[in-house]
């Protein structure tokens, strides 16, 4: 079977995941490596109708194909005690959609880059919830539904807050908070991300996000290219 490599970016809001993913993809393509943005149709930047339709399609396919694992995932999300019922539904749909996309990626050759993959979804579940169920959700993923590599875009909470205050788009929930509350929430998110990364069962590489986007993208592309040339493949 042709080689595949699923890579996810993760980091605080404002770290530049979308910008870096697109630029890294272009750099990899220039190096002769086939690379797609695997979750672009369900990302926050996608048109709302397309995002919801694509997410619903993926979540439905995953739930009908793997009902037992879907039931276990639903129980874990419910146990996380999300702050609002609508959040419970939303994060479960996001989780199932990412599982479905990953399964498809591992059946397709090339590099598949996720702006927000497994770890970022766990971060969202943890940030909005009152109880940590990340270990249960990791256990919910068979190898074909895990990324092969996690690239953490490291950015201090203070810098993330400064970037978000100057950003015209409103993709992050924390942008609706006042300055002090935003910084507190980002600091909490920074601690949570550190905990999740420490418990991540797949390889992790850290890239500083306090540099220009082009420099970040160049480093991410280098990391991915090294992994690709090393022949890392998901177990089948």
What do these predicted ranges mean?
Residues 17:
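Conserved lysine of the Walker
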Residues 20:
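Hydrophobic positions on the alpha1 helix immediately C-terminal to the Walker A/P-loop
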């Amino acid at each position: 079977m042709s080689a595949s490599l699923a890579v996810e970016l993760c980091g605080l809001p404002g770290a530049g995941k979308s910008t870096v993913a697109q630029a890294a993809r272009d750099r990899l393509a220039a190096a002769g490596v086939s690379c797609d943005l695997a979750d672009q149709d369900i990302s926050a930047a996608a048109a709302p109708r397309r995002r919801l339709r694509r997410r619903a399609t993926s979540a439905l396919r995953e739930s009908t194909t793997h009902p037992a694992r879907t039931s276990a995932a639903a129980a874990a999300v419910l146990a996380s005690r999300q702050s609002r019922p609508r959040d419970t539904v939303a994060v479960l749909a996001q989780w199932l959609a990412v599982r479905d996309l990953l399964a498809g990626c591992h059946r397709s050759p090339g590099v598949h880059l996720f702006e927000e993959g497994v770890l970022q979804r766990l971060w969202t579940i943890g940030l909005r919830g009152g109880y940590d169920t990340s270990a249960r959700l990791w256990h919910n993923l068979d190898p074909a539904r895990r990324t092969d590599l996690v690239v953490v875009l490291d950015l201090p909470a203070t810098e993330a807050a400064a970037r978000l205050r100057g950003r015209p788009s409103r993709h992050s929930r924390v942008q609706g908070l006042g300055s002090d509350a935003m910084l507190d929430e980002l600091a909490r998110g920074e601690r949570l991300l550190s905990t999740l990364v420490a418990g991540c069962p797949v390889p992790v590489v850290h890239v500083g996000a306090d540099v220009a986007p082009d420099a970040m993208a160049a480093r991410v592309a280098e990391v991915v290219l090294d992994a690709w040339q090393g022949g890392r493949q998901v177990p089948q």
